[in-house]
Each structure stands twice: as structure tokens, then as C-alpha cells.
Amino acid sequence: MKAEIIAVGTEILTGQIVNTNAQFLSEKLAEIGVDVYFQTAVGDNEVRLLSLLEIASQRSSLVILTGGLGPTEDDLTKQTLAKFLGKALVFDPQAQEKLDIFFALRPDYARTPNNERQAQIVEGAIPLPNETGLAVGGKLEVDGVTYVVLPGPPSELKPMVLNQLLPKLMTGNKLYSRVLRFFGIGESQLVTILADLIDNQIDPTLAPYAKTGEVTLRLSTKASSQEEANQALDILENQILDCQTFEGISLRDFCYGYGEETSLASIVVEELKRQGKTIAAAESLTAGLFQATVANFSGVSSIFEGGFVTYSLEEKSRMLDIPAKNLEEHGVVSEFTAQKMAEQARSKTQSDFGISLTGVAGPDSLEGHPVGTVFIGLAQDQGTEVIKVNIGGRSRADVRHIAVMHAFNLVRKALLSD
């Protein structure tokens, strides 16, 4: 089934609102195996909408129109679709009853004739009840093309799609997806390594997406069941993770988790809870961002002892008891300072782990180090590890954000090695 989404509303074309409905619809249709080939926005104009319907009817088997179902004069979607199909508009009894109840409960509201339009559907259409609003939707098949009209407000459209439309469209295979998350490898390198798999993909498919500091791979397949999909996705996942970088490192070393909502921070917090271990932090360039990220998760009082924000040399010395002369000798941006910050954070809070971040966020260099130079220390029973990362060519905010991601990844690896 080839689907097309037509968003009706001049406010979309003028940029007054963002068409989030198209994204939502495309995602939900993909989940049931319906491919969206076209997305279009058109203003509140009958002539242009008629022209677009003519084009859509020739190239798509499912045409979904969103918006323009309200009571005002510029709400003309149903009227225009009826004219295009040569059909009349009729009243849906359930929608009329909902209008009656709505105005009966609001005696101060004037029930003007244009309000009745919200209860109309194209003749022959299956009504799609509106759970949160008054404008009824509809689904109608004519000459092999299925036409659907949906309200524009997302609060009305989403429940109508989830509870009314999708169950009526679901036939055959569905689309199942799995998201792999990678850190420490760039999109260009990952795509180059996986070039053969990407170039020769049919089903299942894989698609890379770059985000700040990380890369995700979406694996998708059409199948009749989750079990069938898992078999296909497992094979592709293993093919991906068995690949190696140019340096001979397995991609398994860079894959840290699954899913849209997973993050390095969430992985670390859950693993600390599972192992019953605690962590403390001492931060310089990130100014508490690591600690704030930990605190975003509920129940972290069991794993997060506290921390220090020591931006200046003086505060590093005062709060962490690191001799100022040693800091001056080695520099605040150094392996020595990262080591001592991590060790003192751990010691002072009696935590299992002490993490530290010190470096150059920008825009100016510091102590001869270019912007993006970051030292991260991790102190634990087995000793202290310090890594140096270079996050060049980024904004100040990105340097700090990615530095925190590196810190979480360092903790993650330590937890997994235990």
C-alpha cells in the first residue's frame, strides 16, 4: 500500500505551526507495514486542494488528509473531498449526539449553524469517532483508493489514529524495528565499515542516524509476528557487530545499548543500582553537568553520594585538598589533575567510583591545550584510569555534553569489566 499524507492548513505553510502530525502518522503507518511515499502541505484553498487530490489519487492507494474539519469557513477538507469524489456530505448520528451533549452542558455557548459541520462525513464513509474533540473523521474507499480525513489538533488526531484508524488498516505483515546505539565511533566510519550491508540491503534494512556524540542504527523488517521479526533482526545485528574498524576493533565494543530512549547515562545508572555501587564526581569544565545528568533519574540517592564543582584552580585545591603548587606545576588541564580530582572525589565521599572531568570547553585555548581537550579520570579499588579525548570543532555546549558522555562510557566499561 502506497500512502500519501496531505496536511491542510495555511498556518502550516506560513510557519505558524509545525506539522508534527505527518511525523506521527508516518511512524505509526510504518509500524503496520504501510509505506508513506509522499507528504504535502496545502493551504485552505479549494482549488489547490482539488488539484492535489487529483494527483494523489493517481499515485497513492491511501490518501490521508489532516486538518480542516472544524466549524469555520476555511475548514473545507471534507467539503472539498466530497466535491472531488462527487458525493454528498451526510450527518453521523453519533457525532451529532456528541454535539448535542456538548452544548447542553454549556448553556452559555451559542450553537451556530456552522458548528453542525463538525458532525458531517462524506457519504459512504466509515466514521472515525473523535474521543477528545467534536469533529468526526472518516474513511472511504473509492475506485481502489482509500481516503481518510483526520482532525488537525494532535490531541484529537493521535487517539483517532491509534484507536480508530490503525485497527482498520492493519492487514498482513507489520514493520518491526530495533535500534542499536553506538558511542566512540563516527557516522562516516560506521557507514564505510557497513557499506556492503547498506548497499545490498533488501529486507531487513538498516539506516544510520547521527546524533550529538553518538550514532544509532535502525534495523527494520516486515514480518507477521515479533518472533519472525526477531529472527531476521538477530541475523542482521550479528552481521553488523561482527564487523571491525580499520584498526581491527569489533563494533561490539562501541555498541552500548538498544532503543530510542536509552542513553549512556541510563545504562550506567541502572548498572550501578544493579551492582549496588556508588559514584561521586568532581567537575571542572562541565560545571556539574555529569551530576545533573545522574540526578535526572529517579532513585539515584542509592548510587550517587554527591560531588564537587571545582571550576578554578583555587577551588580544586580548597575543596579537594590538592596542593595548589602541584596544580600549578602540572596545570589544571592535565592527566595529573584529572587523576587527583577523581581520587579525592571518591575518598571524600567514600564512594566506589570517583569520576572527574577537566579540560577546555572554549572558545579560547588554555595552558597551550586547544579547545576540546578533555581529561577524564576514574578512580576505583583497582586504581585510577585517566583518558584524554579531543572534541574539536564543536560548540562550547557540545564539548561539555560529549565530555560527559565519555565520562559515562568510561564508567560503563568499568562496571562491565567487574
Swiss-Prot record:
The source's superkingdom equals Bacteria
Pfam families attached to this UniProt entry = CinA, CinA_KH, MoCF_biosynth
Q: Which InterPro entries match?
A: CinA (IPR050101), CinA-like_C (IPR036653), CinA_C (IPR008136), CinA_KH (IPR041424), Competence-induced_CinA (IPR008135), MoaB/Mog-like_dom_sf (IPR036425), MoaB/Mog_dom (IPR001453)
**What residues form the membrane-spanning segments?**
none
Q: Which Gene3D superfamilies match?
A: 3.30.70.2860, CinA-like, MoaB/Mog-like domain
Family of this protein: Belongs to the CinA family.
Recorded protein name is Putative competence-damage inducible protein
- Organism, by scientific name, is Streptococcus pneumoniae (strain Hungary19A-6)
Q: What is the lineage of its organism?
A: Bacteria, Bacillati, Bacillota, Bacilli, Lactobacillales
Please name the gene that encodes this protein.
Answer: cinA
